[in-house]
A protein has these predicted regions:
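Glycine-rich phosphate-binding loops of nucleotide-dependent enzymes
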Residues: 2-265
Length: 265
């Protein structure tokens, strides 16, 4: 039997304490290329904290984060971005006073400079702009390339954040409630972008999302956190039907109703 492929991303006994409170409690998970894993749980379950530990916004009390089999626990957020972890936040993280095209160009420039010996392939500022325009076309933002990021509607800011992540060429895409604050018309657009990333087949995608209809439409795996602990992990239908999940996560929903939106946090 061939050996199992090395996970793209892995957490081993990942733990963080704030005083006497254990916010994430020895969570071990492996994530492979070509998969989309939704991380769900009730308000305060530790979902965003777990994301912050993976992307380097928080430092673990104990445990490890591995990327491609390499221990990256000691790296901060910038170092993990350079190594291949891309993150979109609940609140968009853009350069608001720069044009849309410049937001993407800066990501490409940062990636090129981080590539060291590959820097020579970039001959001019014009090359970065040309590539930025291609990413903007992929997220349908070409028409607003010269608009200040601050002036974009919320849905377009989300799309710009996806373009920036794509420009960084990460191995791991992390989306923290990507549909938060979006209108009914905007939600399908961002979901379509995530679908396209998944369909490419070579990226590892993690998603924190409180809308169960969104989770069911995107995820091929769900993990459930409750009080900082991993309480369920598996295919969506099985996880959603689990009595443990019904009690821990969907307890406020009518019995048998697994599609209701749950509290987020």
């Amino acid at each position: 039997m061939p050996a199992a492929a090395t996970p793209v991303l892995e957490t081993r006994d990942l733990t963080i304490r704030f005083g006497g409170h254990v916010a994430v409690d020895a969570v071990s998970c492996a994530f492979h290329a070509g998969t989309l894993t939704a991380i769900v749980g009730p308000n305060g379950a530790g979902k965003t904290t777990y994301f912050n530990l993976i992307s380097g916004q928080l430092t673990a009390t104990s445990g490890a984060v591995l990327l491609g089999g390499d221990d990256i626990t000691a790296l901060g957020a910038a170092g993990r971005t350079r190594r291949g972890i891309g993150r979109a936040f609940q609140i968009t993280n853009l350069f608001p006073n720069l044009p849309v095209i410049e937001n993407v160009r800066l990501a490409i420039q940062a990636r090129a400079r981080g590539a060291g010996s590959l820097l020579s392939r970039w001959s001019s500022h014009r090359d970065w702009i040309a590539e930025a325009e291609r990413y903007l076309a992929e997220v349908n933002l070409s028409a607003v390339r010269d608009t200040l990021a601050a002036a974009l509607p919320h849905g377009d800011k989300r799309k710009l954040e996806v373009a920036i992540m794509m420009a960084l060429e990460p191995d791991v895409f992390m989306f923290d409630e990507p549909t938060a604050g979006m209108s009914v018309d905007e939600v399908p657009v961002i979901l379509d972008l995530i679908h396209k990333l998944k369909a490419a087949g070579d990226k590892t995608i993690l998603l924190v999302e409180h809308k169960m209809d969104v989770v069911r439409s995107l995820a091929d795996r769900i993990i459930v956190l409750h009080n900082g602990q991993l309480v369920a992990d598996g295919e969506p239908a099985a996880v959603i039907a689990s009595p443990v999940v019904q009690e821990a996560y969907l307890g406020q929903a009518p019995k048998g109703d697994a599609t209701r939106e749950a509290s987020h946090g």
